[in-house]
Amino acid sequence: MSIERQWGEESASIFTLLKLTDMQKIVFTLLGSLLGFLVFAQDATDLRKKHFNTGDGIAIRGYDPVAYFTQNKAVKGSSEWSTSYEGVTYYFSSASDKEEFRKAPARYEPQYGGWCAYAMGKDGTKVDVDPGTFKITGGKLFLFYNQFFTNTLKSWNKDEPNLHRQADNNWQKLFH
């Protein structure tokens, strides 16, 4: 089947007007597809930059996302060991943590772009966090606001299944 028949008369007329060979048509089609993919990828990166909690351009206020899992505590990272993933920059406390993150970034990224999980679940708002107040559940990192006598991790624990479900829904709405 020729490209003209596969894509319809409008496309066929464009190819015919341009007097392209079959190989040129294939190259033209592939370049168009690649351009579309690059535009989509850039949009996704821009969306992450817009919605992730990156004060001073750094995620989790510079804390090492891998250390939450390996040391079960918040450990300050360093610009010496930094990497960017889809437009978001992370700091690490060691070269090995940086390498571990690069192997599986989605495994270590905090949920809800690093915003307070409780606030995202309660009303879909982006509230800053205390990197030292966290919970790992189901292999995922959740961060919480903890200032001025308010520790939202305690509130989250009281109704975690409902808040978690609602936070997932609210976070998805930000990306559509």
Segment roles from a protein language model:
Residues 11, 98-99, 149-152:
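Short, surface-exposed beta-strand/loop "edge" segments at domain boundaries and coil↔beta transitions
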Residues 42-86, 108-176:
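Intrinsically disordered, low-complexity terminal tails and linkers in eukaryotic proteins, enriched
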Residues 91-93, 97-109:
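Mature extracytoplasmic domains of secretory-pathway proteins
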Residues 1-44:
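Bacterial Sec-dependent N-terminal signal peptides
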Residues 15, 94, 146:
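Short coil/turn motifs at helix boundaries and re-entrant loops, enriched in small/polar
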